[in-house]
Design a protein with these regions (language model features):
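Thiamine diphosphate
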Residues: 1-87, 98
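Glycine/aspartate-rich loop-and-adjacent alpha/beta segment that forms the canonical ThDP
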Residues: 76-127
Length: 162
């Protein structure tokens, strides 16, 4: 579809969500990872270079969890009157075995505004009184909830294994 956009002189912004796996087929490596399905080293497709090779001038890579920068980039790119590509990069949270941060919600600081619930994180639920609870067994440690909370009701407490 990106090639057709370029060929037909369309406008618009395409987002490529690159977490170094093919999620729809069960966490398999894809052509940009540099590994075959058997885990053997192979040539890695350079996604930004591929986009540029078909004529896309505006190709931006951004960390998927850097919300402020991502929001800024999206606003800039959708305002352009030509095709642009935003590539969000972040490892698949289900395959990343590194130590994860542990977040807790301070119910006494929670203003019940719901901003932290906007991403739809399955680890976040509301208590009966409307305050937030974080299930640490489901939390992937991405920190989006802490970033979105303007009342410091969500806190990083330690790093631990998940």
């Amino acid at each position: 579809s990106l090639m057709n956009m370029m060929y037909n002189k369309a406008t618009g912004t395409v987002m490529i969500l690159d977490n170094s796996t093919t999620g729809m087929t069960g966490h398999q490596d894809h052509a940009a990872t540099g590994k075959t399905l058997l885990g053997e080293p192979t040539y890695a497709i350079d996604i930004p270079a591929l986009c540029r090779a078909i004529g896309v001038k505006n190709v931006v890579e951004v960390n998927a969890f850097d919300i402020e920068k991502l929001e800024k980039v999206v606003k800039e790119e959708v305002a352009k009157d030509e095709v642009s590509v935003i590539i969000t990069k972040s490892p698949c949270v289900l395959l990343d075995k590194s130590k994860k941060p542990v977040y807790i919600a301070h119910e006494d600081k929670c203003k019940k505004c719901g901003m932290c619930m906007k991403p739809g994180c399955p680890a976040m639920t509301r208590n009966v009184d409307g305050t937030i609870h974080i299930d640490d067994t489901m939390c992937t440690g991405c920190g989006l909830c802490e970033t979105l909370c303007k009342f410091e009701a969500i806190e990083l407490v330690e790093a631990g294994d998940r």
